[in-house]
Amino acid sequence: MEVSDFTAESYDNADMKPFLVPYLVEDQLAAKGNMIVIAGGGYSSRGNAMEGYPIAEAFQDLGYNAYVLQRRVAPYSQEDTWLDMQRAVRYLRYNADSLGLGGMDCIAASGFSGGSGTILGEVANLYGNVQPTLYDADYASDAVDQMSADLDVVCPLYGPQYDGEHTSDYAGLITENPNLPAMFLAVGENDATGAMPDIWTLANSARGKTVVEVHTFAEVGHGFGAGLQGTTSTYWIPMADTFIDLVMGRGEAGVGEAAEIPEGYTQVQQYTFEGGFGKADVTCAVDDAKTKVYMTFVAFDQQQVVEGVLNDGIITVTYDQSGFMTNDAQAIYNAADQNNWQPVA
């Protein structure tokens, strides 16, 4: 890609090549996932000292392989940074075996301000099998580019407008991406850049298409990085970790944990159900005589639990944790394959 307009104010040189700085866990068999970290600084600089390296270290301590993405910045364009993000995701997938990386069922990204925009620009425009030629007609695709660029979870912090401008007509995430990642969003209530109202626009544009969680922190402005001491923003990284566990189905509130199934249920199966609340991965359990049923899944951004008694396959709901699922319970149970029950482990 030919780049011009390098000046004394340019942050990157003409020969800048983006790269990843790895923070790998010792035991790759125990790796929880792979977290790409993108520091802020708009599209003109990289604030790695506050929003890059400390974040990667924190996620590494929690059991993730973490990587600080050194994306191209000014005078490179915002589209160039999105391409760098896309390449980073594909690089990890392509090289996972040769590098011996674990946790490849979860590729996530955390970004701050312009780093947030880098993530969202990739999610909106360079997802899945979309090729870099979308923005660079001269780009020569290689084997790495045949990998999916989809992310599983994203944590965009205080920077939802990914086109580089904070405008009053911001409409959120405009995309045809059919596989939106789960979104953990966070912003300070005193953020003067416009990120505070924008984050709700972003959240609302993604609701019903993926799992979305939003946190706003009191007495916190723009650029809090790992958290501003003396405020609850210092908890965002462990909260993001819990969120990832939730959506990946491995935490206490996750879907598919055999330990969650109450005593008395002996057969279980998992399947996908799509209803008025969207698409959900359901864990459904019954007893041997099929006289009672237990179902758990995520809907309306929270864990749902429904229990009931069965009479010839007809459910009478006896417990509905949220109070919203009783009317859907029969349809959810009917979606189970009655020939595919497995013993509860």
PLM segments and residue spans:
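Catalytic nucleophile-loop/oxyanion-hole region of alpha/beta-hydrolase
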Residues: G47-A49, L69-G103, Q229-S233
